[in-house]
A protein has these predicted regions:
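Acidic/proline-rich low-complexity IDRs
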Residues: 2-5, 25, 58
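Single conserved hydrophobic/aromatic residue that forms the stacking wall/gate
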Residues: 1-15, 259-260
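Short, Lys/Arg-enriched N-terminal segments with co-localized hydrophobic residues
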Residues: 9-10, 14-30
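Sequence-pattern detector for short linear motifs
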Residues: 7, 25, 80-82
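PLP-dependent amino-acid enzyme catalytic core
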Residues: 30-259
């Protein structure tokens, strides 16, 4: 309930003036710096140098991590969720109060739940019944409706169910992060530009894990526009080397090597 209140809240100030450190100032001066909802806090996440790691391994280069956990719903997928919904609105594919359906068991669902609640959409997430109770409860707390599918059918079963629901619900939309161009564009226009700016254009190598491919592709486009020599590394599990032409195989790294390539 607390999560839903936070997601749906707007900050209200009753008085015409606010006292800050003993000084009265107009609310407009304060409100200009205060977010009205959580979507305004997406992005502009901090960079942190991993100095101890560099010292431990005797590295001659600085390694910097972008802390996407600072996004309001806790992951890089907040950017994708917001971008896909904004794009669907701009194209006229998503009408006010409509239903959004997405087959996902990961952080994209969390981001979509947050953004959909803020914007007043009904969100249905389809996922295998094998997903943890904790993940289901989090998504429900953020306002999403959960539809479980046969665990043996995996995500393919969840995708099929999402399409079935879309066909049955008037005006419903599947955003489909694996196929949606807004996925990579979100990182091209925000994440990549932030990295370039915050490193003063000194970034030489970018490394990212590959699930949908949106992060690594989008950031690569942005950085290479500024410097074509930036070296990009796509990371996948050694036991499931799909990008190298190998076979998809089980592994323990959630969100990587999702075979929708």
């Amino acid at each position: 309930e607390i999560l839903r209140c936070l997601v749906g809240s707007e900050m209200c100030i009753r008085d015409s003036y606010i006292s800050v450190y003993g000084k009265n100032v107009l609310d407009s001066e304060i409100m200009a710096k205060i977010a009205k909802n959580l979507t305004e806090l997406i992005g502009h996440t901090p960079l942190m140098e991993l100095a101890e790691y560099s010292r431990k391994y005797g590295l001659k280069r600085n390694i910097v991590a972008k802390l996407e956990s600072f996004n309001p719903a806790g992951s890089v997928k907040d950017r994708v969720a917001f971008a896909m919904i904004e794009d669907a609105e701009a194209r006229g594919a998503l009408n006010p109060g409509a239903t959004i359906i997405e087959p996902t068991s990961g952080n994209t669902g969390v981001g979509l739940a947050m953004v959909a609640t803020i914007k007043g959409y009904h969100l249905i997430l389809t996922m295998p019944e094998t997903m943890s109770v904790e993940r289901r409860n989090l998504l429900k707390a953020l306002g999403a409706e959960i539809v479980l599918t046969d665990g043996l059918a995996g995500m393919a079963g969840s995708i099929a169910k999402a399409k079935e629901l879309r066909d049955a619900i008037p005006g419903a939309v599947i955003l489909q992060q694996f196929e949606n161009p807004s996925n990579a564009k979100a990182h091209e226009h925000t994440t990549g530009e932030e990295i370039w700016t915050d490193t003063d254009g000194k970034v030489t190598v970018f490394v990212a894990g590959v699930g949908t491919g949106g992060t690594v592709c989008g950031v690569a486009r942005a950085l290479k526009k500024h410097n074509p020599d930036v070296y990009v590394v796509a990371v996948e599990p050694a036991s499931s080397p799909v990008l190298e032409g190998g076979e998809d195989a089980p592994h323990r790294i959630q969100g990587l090597s999702l075979i929708h390539i």
